[in-house]
């Protein structure tokens, strides 16, 4: 339900409901008085600003994962690069992993700083048709820990949406933290209230310990009415650079992402092999597609970009 305040009680009828502030479930809710008075129904000027700012963004896609360490940010960065291989496609990448931002480093723009123009914050340009925004660009010390509570994180996410001059984009990929936290609830609420979101790509690795949390992520998407575009199984296999022999990195004790997708009726978008060259490029900020465009992993990312573009 898109009109439920983020700090509402569990069975909130919705701020625009005739029962808003009057239902039994409203008892004790911090918004009860506002809802009953009708004041909370007034348009949020910030959400109007988000709507206006994103009006020229054709597709908005969340990149999610149940666990950390599955390569979600690497998938987000390389999918953005794969989409941007076509110079006619304009791509933006928003990093809302507030406490652990990675995109500035992965995209080779870690030393850049955000500048403000008359139209708002200027995103960092990676190449002519690829831009990125992250809290990493706002920190004086790149090693500085971000120790924030939820409300402050939510405010920054809203600021990234309403104050960054995103311009005209074909795709805005949103790299989120692992799990389902304040950042996820906020970004979903802001995007749905301000317009729409195309859906989510969920990244996992083959082993059951990762798939367990992916099932929770799928449940989160279904409860928040976010379309699940599909699952990406990262580090699905290892291709030996010497003999091209394919082997498994992780045990598929329960059949991996493929079996889970069949069970839950969710699309399987890609099985991405592990490539140590990609890990090195992520650390150095080099463009993996420029250096290893004929690799098996690059070709899988190209297929993934084509699927997303359909």
Curated annotation (Swiss-Prot):
Residues annotated for [4Fe-4S] cluster 2 binding in this entry: 240, 243
Subcellular location per the Swiss-Prot or TrEMBL entry: Cytoplasm
Pfam families: ParA
Record keywords, A-Z: 4Fe-4S, ATP-binding, Cytoplasm, Iron, Iron-sulfur, Metal-binding, Nucleotide-binding
Main subcellular location: cytoplasm
GO CC aspect terms: cytosol
Gene3D superfamilies: P-loop containing nucleotide triphosphate hydrolases
Needed cofactors: [4Fe-4S] cluster
InterPro entries: AAA+_ATPase (IPR003593), Mrp-like_CS (IPR000808), Mrp/NBP35_ATP-bd (IPR019591), NUBP1/Nbp35 (IPR028601), P-loop_NTPase (IPR027417), YlxH/NBP35 (IPR033756)
One GO MF term attached to the UniProt entry: 4 iron, 4 sulfur cluster binding
Cofactor, how bound (note): Binds 4 [4Fe-4S] clusters per heterotetramer. Contains two stable clusters in the N-termini of NUBP1 and two labile, bridging clusters between subunits of the NUBP1-NUBP2 heterotetramer.
Cross-referenced SMART domains: AAA
GO BP annotations listed: iron-sulfur cluster assembly; regulation of non-motile cilium assembly
Top-level taxonomic group: Eukaryota
Amino acids binding [4Fe-4S] cluster 1: 12, 26, 29, 35
Residues annotated as binding ATP: 66-73
Family: Belongs to the Mrp/NBP35 ATP-binding proteins family. NUBP1/NBP35 subfamily.
Function: Component of the cytosolic iron-sulfur (Fe/S) protein assembly (CIA) machinery. Required for maturation of extramitochondrial Fe-S proteins. The NUBP1-NUBP2 heterotetramer forms a Fe-S scaffold complex, mediating the de novo assembly of an Fe-S cluster and its transfer to target apoproteins.
Quaternary structure and interacting proteins, as annotated: Heterotetramer of 2 NUBP1 and 2 NUBP2 chains.
Name of the featured protein: Cytosolic Fe-S cluster assembly factor NUBP1 homolog
Source organism of this protein record: Brugia malayi (Filarial nematode worm)
